[in-house]
Amino acid sequence: MSFRHFKRRLDTSSADESSSADEEHPDQNVSLTEKSTSLSHSDLGGEILNDTGKNRTPNDGQESNESDESPESEESSDNSDSSDSDDMRPLPRPLFMKKKANNLQKATKIDQPWNTQDDARVLQTKKENMIKNIDKANQVAKNYETMKLRLNTNYSTNEELIKQCMLLDDNDEVDSEKERQKWFERQNERKQKHRRIQLAKQRESEEYEAKRFEAM
């Protein structure tokens, strides 16, 4: 009985000392408890990570395979979409724009370098066009001058005729015998002219008949 009583006293004394130590150093006890809890949490986290790593290894392989296959499927779908879009794409309507010769030559010089033959050909065409334009202008000026001269000459001839007509003396009472003699002379000239014309016609008809008779 005395031994039990002594052991109980020792237990109570150790408990009192521990409680007094706890009261004297509360911060140390709190830090120790925090360290123990952190260690327990870290151990639990490591175990969880190991478990998840073991469980997720096949899934990761599947996901990598799916990620490897996904670009190929996307490329194939893009190719099919692009081919369909190329087939179904409407053709643009052609637009014909008019440009001046100078602008066209500048654009072609900027876009592509010309050869010496092309330059010579262009210069030749320019020269020919210039010569044609000059000839055309000269022809127009010449036609204008000729028309002007014709008008002037017609006007001058008409004026001269009018002057000559005004200078004619048609008064027969001044010298009637002389006027009558001139009239007879003009009449004889007309008769002789008519006779010459008739003789020429008769001679032609006789020659025609003679040729026709020889042909028979």
UniProtKB/Swiss-Prot annotation:
Cellular localisation: Nucleus
Region: Disordered, residue numbers: 1-93, 172-216
Compositionally biased spans, kind Acidic residues: 63-85
Biased composition (Basic and acidic residues): 177-190, 201-216
Superkingdom of origin organism: Eukaryota
Keywords: mRNA processing, mRNA splicing, Nucleus, Ribonucleoprotein, RNA-binding, Spliceosome
Oxidoreductase among keywords: no
Transmembrane spans: none
Record-level GO cellular component terms: spliceosomal complex
One GO term (biological process): RNA splicing
Biased composition (Polar residues): 28-41
Single GO MF descriptor: RNA binding
Main location: nucleus
Oligomer and partners: Component of the 25S U4/U6.U5 tri-snRNP particle, a subcomplex of the spliceosome. Interacts with PRP38.
Family: Belongs to the SPP381 family.
Function description: Component of the spliceosome and rRNA processing machinery. In association with the spliceosomal U4/U6.U5 tri-snRNP particle, required for splicing of pre-mRNA.
Protein name per UniProt: Pre-mRNA-splicing factor SPP381
